[in-house]
């Protein structure tokens, strides 16, 4: 079981890829003017990535985000000079998308449209998938496991693997309480960045060979185990992806090689239930028992 650790990207997550892709594509097309404000609805990682890219390329950035997402995300975006507009939790993901559209139309801002922008999966085809194919050139690869938020990674990588390595099984995963691809109703969940209350336009719904939903607690506990047992500190969605990969491994033929995508770092979840029950004081009781 191997993992692709996307927290090594400069902004700390896989979303750096789509942020750079969308901005460069818009510049080339002339739809983004010099100095124009960029706005996007985000669960956090895309917002951080866009804030970073916009800061580097000279665009003001406004993030529209549900109030349910971690405070670390807001602070990171503001560190890059972004403005953050919060929407009520009851309005869900579709509410923050709607608010971003309204503000873009009102002020003449450039709307990034990560959920429907074809530059999103296209960049994963040319970079993420290319990296995987290069790393596994001449080597066995049987399974690729990825969750979905916008669907860009799953779609772009999945499509290229199907072309280049058609025997590779594409496995997706989503919150057990909001398994939209499995035909279930959306319910609030704690796997931040995954599965808004709609299926994005860029998501290829038929690319996955298997869907393994994962519940919030399993996602959290697997992320904790990965940090304490393997020294890889990741976020909740990465924990969920690894949990799905472990389930896939249980049912895979002996000797199978599985690659799981780990989207981000655990450092932007310090205020969330990923750290629920973790001691914040001195470990005096432990020391006394030594």
Q: Where are the model-predicted features located?
A:
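PLP-dependent amino-acid enzyme catalytic core
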Residues: 1-290
